[in-house]
Amino acid sequence: MLDWDSILAYNTIKVVRIRDRRLGILHLIFMIAIISYVVIYSAIIKKGYLSIEEPVGSIRTSLWSPNQFNGNESYCKNNAKPYPYEKLDCVYYDDALALYPIGDDVGFTASTRIEISDQKANCSLMNPSCKFKTFNYSNVYLADIESFTVLIDHTMYAPSSQIQFNGGDLSGYVLDQNGNEIQLNESVNVIGVEGKPDVLEISKLLEFAGVNLDDPSLTNSSNPIRYDGCVLFVFIEYSNTFSYDLNKIKYVYSIKLVDDTIYNIPEVVILDDVNSRLYYKRHAIRLIFIQTGVIGSFNFQSLLLTLVSGLGLLTVSTLIVDQLAIRFLPQRKSYSSLKFQTTESFKMKKKIVNDDGEDKLYHNIEAL
């Protein structure tokens, strides 16, 4: 016959105070380590009380030409200085001619070389065999593009916490080639100064990316980067978790060159009519802005989850000490008998009043 009392027995917790310094010290060490990890490391150092979100943002850029061009570039044909690559004619375009496309809200393009083709279609474009023919072709460098300056106006917004700031209201930095955060407040280059917009010379921007336009192209070593163009990622990372004051927000620029890429973009200018056009093939420095970061705000549920996670560790530590006591120590049998106790079954017992007037439970009446 099945003993359902044994099968469906209920296990309850029994507190046994084992006077053994080995177990006590081990359990105390576990407790201190777990509390230190949960409270000091997870909750305080790692800021487990914060709800973290990634901000979104917008970018506006402007290109400014220098007040005075250098006029002594070794890559220009009219310069006698040696240059390790083919020299081209140079043109001194202002910012309106050097920038294309205009109004790009996610990137920025500064031309370094332009192929200019004067094309005409001496036929009707309604004819499927009609093609444009090139009558004049020129290939030129945009001289002294490194002296142009870029204004970067950026704004960040964290939807959940509704934190919003313009870059001009924040402190900021830019990472140099060694990964150091530096702040610029020079006559031309300004980065991270509150109340001032961020402005960088293209030469400085390339320097932070470790790029020289006269280095070999990333896809054809017989040409310089100036000839083929390049693509740079400009990361703007916002954070208010670098200190314990959540009202302090900073941003950091990091500029990375995209390997094995060149950049060019076509531009068509219609002249007298659609049959007459100038075709520009621009090779350029392409900047792609990526706004990211970590914005934190106090959240009680996050704090509660951080603290509750420690309860599981406490349970594991108690289990380890218990198993050590009942399975490995020399006194394991004694400790096991103290920890585990099985009651007798009350299934078929009857209540009897004895001669002293006390209630007694017996399995059968013959036990009297």
UniProtKB/Swiss-Prot annotation:
Which residue ranges does UniProt annotate as crossing the membrane? 25-45
Alphabetically sorted, this entry's keywords are: Ion channel, Ion transport, Ligand-gated ion channel, Membrane, Receptor, Transmembrane, Transmembrane helix, Transport, Vacuole
Phenotype on deletion? Answer: Null cells are still capable of osmoregulation and do not show any noticeable differences in their sensitivity to hypotonic conditions. Quintuple p2xA/p2xB/p2xC/p2xD/p2xE null cells displayed slight delay in their osmoregulatory response, but are still capable of regulating their cell volume in water. Extracellular purinergic response to ATP persists in the quintuple null cells and p2xC single null strains with no alteration in the kinetics of the response, but the magnitude of the response is lower.
Residues in compartment: Lumenal:
46-368
| Record GO biological process | calcium ion transmembrane transport; cellular hypotonic response; regulation of calcium-mediated signaling
The record places the following residue ranges in the Cytoplasmic compartment, namely: 1-24
Q: Where do the segments described as Pore-forming motif lie?
A: 282-295
Q: What does this protein do?
A: P2X receptors are ligand-gated ion channels that play a role in intracellular calcium signaling. ATP does not evoke inward currents in p2xC. Not essential for osmoregulation.
Q: Which family does it belong to?
A: Belongs to the P2X receptor family.
* Record-given protein name: P2X receptor C
